[in-house]
Every structure is written in structure tokens, then in C-alpha cells.
């Protein structure tokens, strides 16, 4: 079965937030609905920040993928970060992750992105295998974070 990909708009905020809360719950990340709503509204009304695609199977919403933009001198220009990629549990391991990554790689080339980055939890072996299958590689670097 083939997925359809719909570019998200502010009208989709509620649907995305429902899935985002499930996504965050997988690894026990805190989820503040009011804060998430403000962040999502800002993102979806600022196309220079990135894009979110809704994953649809027939008429059913089964997931989403958020691609954010940034700039890198090392990599030669605008790059993308696959910030969030969620598929509802009952639809996993059915090829929809592969379909989504295939689609996003095409879109990234259309957007003239130089590189795509992503991060995954160490325990997410299925996700890591999928990303490796699509050519994502571990860099011999550490992603460090400082909250401001």
C-alpha cells in the first residue's frame, strides 16, 4: 500500500500534537500541550524553519515527519535535520518508514539541501537499521546539547 504525503498547515496542529504526545511518550520525554501548541503554530507559520508532512494511508492519518532547516559551512550551505519521525505503532514494520524516507530524500534534493542529519535513541535498533539502509551513517562525533 502506498502512502500519501500532505504538507501540514496550521489547521493540522491538533492532529500533529496528538501524535507528537504519543511519540514523546515512547521515551518518556516531557510533553506540555500548551507549549507544544505554541511551538507548532510558530513552526507551521514560518516556512523558512522547515516542513512537516502528514503520512496518510487512504484516509487515515498514520504519522508525520518534521524536517527543519539550518546552515552549515562545513557541508556547503543549507542542510536539513529530520527532527521528528513518528508512525503509529500498528503501522510500523510494514514499509511505511521506507516509503517516507524515500519521499523525504526526493523533497530534500528539490529543496537543494546539502545534507540531512537525524538523531535516534540508542535503543531504537529498528530505526537505526532503517536509516543505515537509506545511507545515513554514524559520524565519529558526539551531538552535544546546552539548554538556554
Predicted regions and their residues:
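Conserved acetyl-CoA pyrophosphate-binding loop and the N-cap/start of the following alpha-helix
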Residues: 91, 95-103
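Conserved GNAT acetyl-CoA-binding A-motif
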Residues: 101, 109-119
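Hydrophobic adenine-recognition pocket in adenosine-nucleotide-binding enzymes
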Residues: 8, 85-87, 120
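Extreme N-terminal starter segment of soluble prokaryotic enzymes
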Residues: 2-4
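Acetyl-CoA-dependent GNAT
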Residues: 7-14, 18-77, 83, 101, ...
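Active-site acidic-Proline motif in GNAT/NAT acetyltransferases
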Residues: 88-90, 94, 122-123
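Conserved active-site alpha-helix within GNAT-family acetyltransferase domains
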Residues: 98, 122-140
Amino acid at each position: 500500500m502506498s502512502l500519501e504525503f500532505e504538507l501540514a498547515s496550521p489547521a493540522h496542529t491538533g492532529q500533529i500534537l496528538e501524535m507528537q504526545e504519543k511519540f514523546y511518550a515512547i521515551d518518556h520525554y516531557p510533553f506540555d500541550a500548551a507549549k507544544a501548541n505554541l511551538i507548532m503554530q510558530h513552526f507551521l507559520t514560518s516556512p523558512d524553519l522547515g516542513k512537516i508532512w502528514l503520512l496518510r494511508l487512504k484516509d487515515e492519518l498514520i504519522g508525520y515527519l518534521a524536517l527543519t532547516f539550518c546552515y552549515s559551512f562545513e557541508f556547503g550551505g543549507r542542510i536539513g535535520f529530520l527532527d521528528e519521525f513518528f508512525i503509529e505503532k500498528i503501522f510500523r514494520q510494514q514499509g511505511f518508514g521506507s516509503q517516507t524516507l524515500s519521499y523525504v530524500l526526493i523533497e530534500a534534493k528539490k529543496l537543494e539541501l546539502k545534507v540531512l542529519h537525524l538523531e535516534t535513541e540508542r535503543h531504537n535498533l529498528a530505526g537505526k537499521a532503517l536509516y543505515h539502509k537509506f545511507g545515513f551513517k554514524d559520524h565519529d562525533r558526539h551531538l552535544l546539547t546546552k539548554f538556554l
